[in-house]
Amino acid sequence: MGSCVSSPLKGSPFGKRPVRRRHSSNSRTSSVPRFDSSTNLSRRLIFQPPSRVLPEPIGDGIHLKYDLGKELGRGEFGVTHECIEISTRERFACKRISKEKLRTEIDVEDVRREVEIMRCLPKHPNIVSFKEAFEDKDAVYLVMEICEGGELFDRIVSRGHYTERAAASVAKTILEVVKVCHEHGVIHRDLKPENFLFSNGTETAQLKAIDFGLSIFFKPAQRFNEIVGSPYYMAPEVLRRNYGPEIDVWSAGVILYILLCGVPPFWAETEEGIAHAIVRGNIDFERDPWPKVSHEAKELVKNMLDANPYSRLTVQEVLEHPWIRNAERAPNVNLGDNVRTKIQQFLLMNRFKKKVLRIVADNLPNEEIAAIVQMFQTMDTDKNGHLTFEELRDGLKKIGQVVPDGDVKMLMDAADTDGNGMLSCDEFVTLSIHLKRMGCDEHLQEAFKYFDKNGNGFIELDELKVALCDDKLGHANGNDQWIKDIFFDVDLNKDGRISFDEFKAMMKSGTDWKMASRQYSRALLNALSIKMFKEDFGDNGPKSHSMEFPIARKRAKLLDAPKNKSMELQISKTYKPSGLRN
């Protein structure tokens, strides 16, 4: 749900979540958008934030105890501020989560669970310390240790050289965090480099895990089917919707792979491509700098990225591996500037895209929401407040969109967050908002204008530098060359400026900008998972590249997934899940 960051925007760079089949029946406060039927239904959707997010009484007097200062970071749900305890003058970080940003019951549960888990975890040098929580009518406030040393990748690229020994030290720290989590019955579920910050700017600063917004409690042998996480770091069994704590070892293995070579092991330009690459599990150990990497390191990465969770190394086995156990003795040979360059480009491009997303995120006017509501009403022929499969299918036909039944089924599965087989107005509107936000050129135009300071229809290098300097990515950190590299990559015709078409092409390649919306990515990855089940487990059994685990095969037979190989819907100008394309 965010972090105690003292660096720019946090969130999944890729990443970064779907239909939930609950393991418990605990009552929950609904926080989804509500339509006020006493008003003109076509006027607007009225969002009613929950009156209480945290289950137990929490003090609402944060401003009596703390002075909130400058902004440290910003994510999809909250803004992190420096805060000072009035009585002691001690500095902390305060994450303010606006209730207006919590658009679904799932979002509310994420906040509740994050607080509960941070209270449960013990004090540990590599886990950010949680102090206390507050709640008032507008927001939830999480007060925790402040981390001012920057992100893991920032520290790597700022050093003059980078070695295998440094990667071993980082990997050991991450695995020790995973061990503590598992010992206390917690699966992290979203391990990625940007969820680790250094406590301060010194060379001896501790690396700390700072975000538990997607973590969950587990019991021995318990399995989960909710798709969460950031695609590049997601284990194959998550996509197959049957997983346990083993997924954290996989994610740590992906991080280690990136630390050693600078790029993710599974890469594609679409979410579907990434998912298939993960399931296929083909890992490249041939390209530079892998020939320089020790056999022990490569062996460890392979065993952490074992596609079978039951033969994958456990966290304890990884920590006992000689390369990790003797991290201080790992080769100290420079892996080359190429690794640092790749990591820096990877980092800055993601931040550029996420800055665009921040601008896009708040630009959806009430008039467009009203249009979505009107569309729902048109489709809801029996006026019972829910869309059945038939109503959605027939409604799409009425507005000129003839969609195959399989794709309609996929859409239903993606949007039906309570799993009752129908779409409420809340579910339809919430998903539509997020998909529209990600696919609409009009919103990208608004973001483009933010960078085009002189209004000449192009983004020039100096304009990009100024915009990214706002996020501490420019001159202050000596990143001029990296910004030039980004500019060169985006400027496809090499005329020294970025047109809107080039800007749009950048934003619609890769997945990170789309996956930054948690609701969007949950729905999208769920739909992809259903599709992959059908492709991998047809009537004749699993294909050759499928994982043939008994539990996964049993689970697959329970799914009634569409046969179609693509999903691309456009409901008028309002609904276009652009990420679901072949």
Curated annotation (Swiss-Prot):
Tell me which residues make up the Protein kinase domain: 66-324
* Residues linked to a lipid group, N-myristoyl glycine type: 2
Enzyme Commission number(s) of this protein: 2.7.11.1
Membrane topology of this protein: Lipid-anchor
What catalytic activity is recorded? L-seryl-[protein] + ATP = O-phospho-L-seryl-[protein] + ADP + H(+); L-threonyl-[protein] + ATP = O-phospho-L-threonyl-[protein] + ADP + H(+)
Region (Disordered) residue spans: 1-36
Give the residues the record marks as binding Ca(2+) 1. Answer: 380, 382, 384, 386, 391
Q: From the UniProt record, which GO molecular function terms apply?
A: ATP binding; calcium ion binding; protein kinase activity; protein serine kinase activity; protein serine/threonine kinase activity
GO cellular component, as recorded: nucleus; plasma membrane
Positions where Phosphoserine occurs in the chain: 230, 499
Q: Where are the annotated segments for Autoinhibitory domain?
A: 330-360
Q: Where is the EF-hand domain?
A: 367-402, 403-438, 439-474, 478-513
Enzyme class of the recorded protein, top EC level: transferase
Biological process (GO) annotations held by this record are: regulation of inward rectifier potassium channel activity; regulation of pollen tube growth
Q: Which domain of life is it from?
A: Eukaryota
> Which Pfam family, an example, fits this chain?
Pkinase
State the family named in the UniProt similarity comment for this chain.
Belongs to the protein kinase superfamily. Ser/Thr protein kinase family. CDPK subfamily.
- Put simply, this protein is called Calcium-dependent protein kinase 24
Origin organism is Arabidopsis thaliana (Mouse-ear cress)
* Gene name tied to this protein: CPK24
